[in-house]
Each structure stands twice: as structure tokens, then as C-alpha cells.
Amino acid sequence: MSDYREELKNKETLRLREIQRELPPFVQAFFRGIAQTTSTKTRLAYAYDLRIFFRYLYEEHRTLGGIEPKDLTAAHLSEVTSEDIDCFMEYLSYYIRPDYENPAYGKEMHNEEKGKSRKLAAVRMLFKYLYKKKIISADPASLVDTPKIHEKAIVRLDVN
């Protein structure tokens, strides 16, 4: 492996560990569990997406609201329903994300179908892993439909 790729992988690994500190402790086991079958980039993308999901639970969930993400337990996820995940998908249309470099400011975020699908994939993987390991008794994420991705029109260049 080239030095550049090795250096990039090391940076991504350190960034992943940094983000995991903001997430519930059981998420670390999830990342260890998928490490053999996913790339560092995939795990990092999942970490970003799960951070948004847990921030949503903190800000919006009817019973988990107000519980810091790093204080959540796997038992708390038993309170999450497929309807909650549907609401999360709607939340992704527009939300204000904290600026992690400068916490006093927020950044407006919008997600179209592709962004929502990617975030749903991360949530599904987490619930699937926890269900498979018998940490939770149900997998509500599997009941949520993936957003339909609309095809972009093919733009052809004309010869002048």
C-alpha cells in the first residue's frame, strides 16, 4: 500500500475514533463488528450519519429527547419505532447541524433522496447488527422504506 493511502487510512481511523467519543458506547462494538467487512471510509461515513441520527433523538424524540447521545444505552433504542425513523427521514430534509469547529454557530443542512438513503443505510446497519447480536429485541429500521431516488436526465453534448 502506498504511503499516501496508508496515511489517509490512519487519518480516517483517528477521525472515526474522535466521532465515536460523541456516540453511545454500544456503537463502538458495532464499528468493531463491521470492521472486517467494510472500509475505513465506509465506517467513517456511518459515524457521521449515526451522529446525526443520535443528535436527532436528543433534539426531537418524545422520550429520549434531552439524553445526550453518549449517555444512551442499547436499551434506550428499544423505544425507537419505525415511525420515529420515518420522522428522522423527514427531519433530514432540513435541519441545523452544530458546527463542530465552532459550537456557537450552526450550519443549515438539506438532504435529497440520495443523502437520506445513505443515512438510512447507516441506521439500518446499526439496528441490524444490534438485533443480530440479540442486544435489542426488534429491528424497526428494516420496516422503513428507502426513499425513491429519481434519475437525473442524461445531458448530451452536441457537436458544433
What annotation goes with each model-predicted range?
Residues 1-44, 59:
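N-terminal DNA-binding module of tyrosine recombinases/phage integrases
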Residues 27-41, 51-153:
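N-terminal core-binding DNA-recognition domain of tyrosine recombinases/integrases
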Residues 158:
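Short, conserved phosphate/pyrophosphate- and ester-handling motifs at nucleotide-, phospho-/glycolipid
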